[in-house]
Amino acid sequence: MTEFVVLIPARLDSSRLPGKALADIHGKPMVVRVAEQAAKSKAARVVVATDHPDIQTACQAHGIEVVMTSNRHESGTTRLAEASAALKLPPHLVVVNVQGDEPLIAPELIDRTAEVLVENNVQMATAAHELHDFDELMNPNAVKVVLDKNRNAIYFSRAPIPYPRDAMRAGKREMPSETAVLRHIGIYAYRAGFLQRYAEMSVSPLETIESLEQLRVLWHGYPIAVETAKEAPAAGVDTQEDLDRVRAVFQTV
């Protein structure tokens, strides 16, 4: 398998759950739990990228490699661009972006996302899973993605895509039957050199409207390969209820 590293963007500010990166999960901060889970993958190296000294201290206390970045980043991807430059990662090296609020992420998903990037010879790869619930299709917090025949992303949106026009006209809460509806999974793989290119690209209007950083890549004409996971991954931590659920999982381990 191609060598890759995991970079984890982590910030302390969170509108829905302040300080969640350092939230205690069975005796360890969440960001440490994420890094330990990522270390179960085939990654050659796992590094947390943060702008906060408290996160840096927590990672160092648990033996997690950490690199400090600016506090002016609008997205995790630009933070990782700075981190990869600071770490002097070679341009060809594969980097997997694991979100800092995913303490239950499957190591196999990390490995597979890196593989998809290499297999498809693209600049960026991500993942999705089939969606079967109508309420989730309509939920703007559930990001959907539609693919072309080559399994590359056509578009990501918080809106219901593909839109079931006939069912909606008839007042029916039915999922599209002609194709699978896919919910995006927030994991990315890219070459370190492309991270630098991403940071230099202009912000796209679609990215701003939808608040989805991956739309910058499509806007500038680069394909994004999408791996379809066999099942939905464990949910990340956005709210206190999510945190309580994750804590319960770790208590049973």
From Swiss-Prot:
Gene3D superfamilies: Spore Coat Polysaccharide Biosynthesis Protein SpsA, Chain A. It catalyses: 3-deoxy-alpha-D-manno-oct-2-ulosonate + CTP = CMP-3-deoxy-beta-D-manno-octulosonate + diphosphate. One of its GO terms (biological process) is CMP-keto-3-deoxy-D-manno-octulosonic acid biosynthetic process. Keywords: Cytoplasm, Lipopolysaccharide biosynthesis, Nucleotidyltransferase, Transferase. One of its GO terms (cellular component) is cytosol. HAMAP family: KdsB. Activates KDO (a required 8-carbon sugar) for incorporation into bacterial lipopolysaccharide in Gram-negative bacteria. This is 3-deoxy-manno-octulosonate cytidylyltransferase.
